[in-house]
Every structure is written in structure tokens, then in C-alpha cells.
Amino acid sequence: MRTRICLTALAAACLLAGPAGATEPDVAPALALLPEEAVAFFHVPSLSALEKGLKHFADQTGWTIGKGERPILDLLARRTGLVQGIDPTGSVCIGFLDPKRFRQRYTIYVLPVSDWDALLKSSRGEVMSPGLYALMGVSGPRFVARRGKFAVVTSSIRTMDAVLGARSLIEALPAETVARAVSDAPMLYLNVDSVKTIYESEIASWFRASSGQVYDQPNAVPYADMLVTYMLGIASFIDQMETVEAALKFEPEGLAADLKIRFVDGAAVADFLSAQAPGILPIPAVTEQPVSSAVTFRLNPARRTDFALRATRFFLESAPRPEPLPESTKKTVYEAVQVFAESLGDHITFLSAPAQPGMGVESGVAVYELVDPERFRHGVELLAASWEGLADQLNLYLKFKALPDMTDLAGVPVVTYVPRLRFGIPARHVEFRQRLRMLYGPEGMVYRVAVVGNYAVVATGSDLTVFRKAIEQLQKADGPAPSPAMRRLYNHISRDENLLIALSLPVYLGQSLARGGTAADRIGTVDPGHEVIGFGVRFGKAEAEVTTYLPHEQIRLARELLSRALPEATDIPESLFKPAPEGPPGAGVVPLKPLFPPDTPVVPPTAPNAESPPPIAAAPAPRPK
């Protein structure tokens, strides 16, 4: 330990003696003090601007972030022990190193300082070397390095050693990432590739355990391959991610957030996504009642079909299952998916709305742009027949009963598909059917298909309100028109995205609570408001950009709903800023747990070693009986 402290002090002295340009870069100076090996950071260009934005957010939504006048400054004081001398207008950066290598003491705080004398006096800083201090007035070890107008704070001298003298993270970041950090928006950065490397063994172990638990469930083997295939797909997507960046902007009437995902070189998902052409079909105002969610996206038809076929082939041939499927079953399912996918055009829109009283919890509608309406009808018939055969091979019971609807909607013929499902433990068949009726109405899970010109409308559930309105909108000569709320959303999210999601947050939240079993009287009457939340996704070469806009009105109404249905949820943001129950007077710092318990036997090292802590002695061998 003494050797490590000496090396750290020497590095600090050398850096302080260097040219000013080396320690205080012109771009993002707080960020420039993080070492290259940082795997994540949170950068705030201005503390005062962030707290001003949070105060405006609290005034508009009622969701208070902290109780004090300066919640962020108070939070930093509790985490670092630095109570006085911090510049409330400066920039802040919090970096994170490898948790395994640094034994849970991996956090680096870079704070702006306006008065070094007040800072050191209030925290009882003792000089270790020029520019390096040990804080004696706080709970747990704290070390501070003076770097120009900034204080670098760590809870371990070994962590400080990794900071001082290391190559700056800014030199390793892409130029656009640095430019984003210099802007006036708080920014979060995560190197997903590094995190995957650090936790590779834990991730593999978790996946093996999770998939094993799936197969261990009674009567779950027929469905386990579906769930494991889904898990593999999510894991594959994450495995192709390289970095994630997020920036938050406070606007007068809402919050705007930008998210950027970069994929590793040669990622299959990037190759697929980069081929998509921009352009969005406007989400129609399909009903007078609020639509809880609407999703519309445009995909390149050839790439989309290729993706659907590759996913189907993987499910049929590579998904883990006790016995392989017969070739005849795989062939019919594959051909059905191919015919259906090739009949679709660029645009697909999904709508969800609360059902009318007595008609279940929700009603869903999908609107597909078609290349060939007749081929679409044939594809639906093939899908129904092929999935019946697949269900039989998986020891399920699934039959589709197709019948023409007795009453056409707006003069459009409707075909109804009634699936008959039976699976799992026989005693739960009735419970399963009751669950479907609760969700979708008296008919349970029912699909209705109507073709309107070059569009297909597919409805789920007994409530036909949204289904009828969508058909009427598509019959108009000028096509569907966006609702007023959607037109206002277009001011914040560009329409030339590949994927656009719009939500009425309180309606969507109320619908989700009802689906989860929350009593209707606790949910009460849901006010949809006049705005909608939007998520837009644009795919580029080896990257995806996500733009989000959350109006204050939607957040306020969602909070009012949560205060009735889940009052404990409204305290979650405030709990992050509550003072710790223990700590020194005025600082509120949570005492750090010791690396080793006081009574743990430790073998002293044979020689001074600045790189690794002393090993724990092995437990004595048991006596032979």
C-alpha cells in the first residue's frame, strides 16, 4: 500500500507540473480527466442548468426530484463527502471502471471547484503530496486529486492510481461522442462491448441457468424452445451492440431524449437495419376514444422477408428441443411464412386501445400495406394450416376455425379466425380461457381480417370500435390523416424515421395495470390528455438513433394514475435523493463496507505489490474422522 501511495503521489506531482493544455483541454475538461479504461460515464455540462431543468420538470409534472433547493449538489456531497467549495455552475463527470478489477471501488467523481480552501477545510483534507489529499472528515476512505479547476475524487488509492497518468478517455472516443458531451445536454455513455467482456462468464452462466429453468418446468417442453429462441434473439442483439449514448434535453413543454446505439463491425443486425428506407405512413386518428399505443414502421420488403425467413429457419431447425421436427412440418411452415411475408408492402402499423366496458381489457388492430391482396389472403390461410401442423408436432392443440363474419363492416367483407387452444396442465385449460376472455372479451382470442384496397386490417378481440374506424379511414380518397396530437408530435420527432411509436402514457399505463390484475376501482377514470409520447428510430449504417419526446402533461397524468393504483411507485425518484441513514454530520456519506471483514485472516504478501491486494488465507482442511 505504501508503494502504491508513493507511485500515485509521484504521478500527481508530474501531471501538475506539466503544461496547462495537457490537464485542461478546451473540450469537455471534466470528461478529459477520466482514464481511457472507463467503461461508462455520466457528464453534466452545467450543474445549475440541470437543477433548473429538474425544477421546471417538478413544477410541471408534480414529480419532485429531491427535497432541497440543490438536489444534485446535495447528492454529490453525500457520495463524495465534499460539502463546500463546489462550483454550482460548473460541469460534472462521473466515470465507472471495471468493477471486478477495482473491487467495487470503481467510481470516479470529477467535480468543479470554486474554493479549494473551503473544500479542504470542510472535509479535513490532509496533503499526501502536492495536489493529492486524503479526506479525514468523511466516512470511509476518500482521496482527492487537484486537477486545475476540478477535483478528482475516488474511494481507493488504487482507483486514483488508474486515473493519474493514464491516457485520457477523450482521446479514445469518436469525435461525434465528444461533440455531444460538449453540448448543453447531460449525457450518459456505456461501452457495451467492454461490459460484455467483463461479465462474459456471468452472462453465460445466467443464460444456461435461465434456459435450464425453462425446460425444467412441468409440461413446458413444447413451449420451452419458443422462449429460449426468444432469449437467444435478445442475447444476439445485445452481443452485436458496441456502445450506447444518451442525451437529455429539458424543453418548455416536455423532455426530449436522444439515444444512439453503435454496433460492432460486421454485425448482422446493422446490415439488416441499414438497408431500410426512411418515410412513415401517418398514424391515423382511428377512434374518438384514446388509442393507448400506435407503432408504425417502414422496412425494406426484400430485407424484411429475408429476416423473417432466417428467423423461421432458426426456430424450425436450430432451436433447442428434445426431438427434431419432421421435414414436412418445417417445409409447410417455411412456405407459409414466405408467401405471407412476400405479400406485404413497406408499411405496417399496430394500434392498441382500451376495450369498451364488458368487452375485455384491450382491442388491437394491425394495418398492413399490401403488394398483392390475393397473395395475402392465401398466405393467411397457409399460416393457419401450417401452424396447426406445427402445434401437433409440439404436443399442443391449436386449430383455426375460419368463417365469414355475418355483418360486413362499412361494406367490407370480414373473415374471422377463431383459434382453439389447449396446452399445459389440463386443470388449467379453464383458467387459460378465462384469462383470454378477460383480456379480449367474451369471444376470447379472435382474429378478424379485412382487405381494403391495398391494405389489410387485422383485429384482435371482441371490441370492433378501432377495427371499424380504421376501415373507414382507409376507405377515404385522401387516405388516413394524422390526429392533432400526432401533428404536434411531428414538431419534435421527424416523420422520416424507420420506426415511430406513439403512446398515450396514462391510457397505456392504465391498460397495463388492468392486464396485470389491478382492480378497476384503484385505476379509476383515466384522463388521456391532449398530447402523446413519441419514440422515433432511424437506422443508419452500423448504428441506430432513437429520438424521444415526453410531454409534461402525459407524465403528470401518469403520476396521478400511479398515485391511485401504485402509490409506492411515486416515491421512487425521490428515494434516490434521500439522505443516507448514517454518515458524518453535514455530509450524509454512506459508510463504505470494508474490503475484508475485521476478523478475516489475511496472509501478508511476500513482497510489496502495488497491483493486487493481499490474498485471503485458505480455510483449514477438515480433520479426518
Q: What residue ranges belong to the model's regions?
A:
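Intrinsic, low-complexity N-terminal interaction/targeting segments
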Residues: R79-C93, V412-L439, A519
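One face of beta-strands
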Residues: A40-F42, V92, T107-Y109, V152, ...
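Bacterial N-terminal signal peptides
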Residues: T8-A17
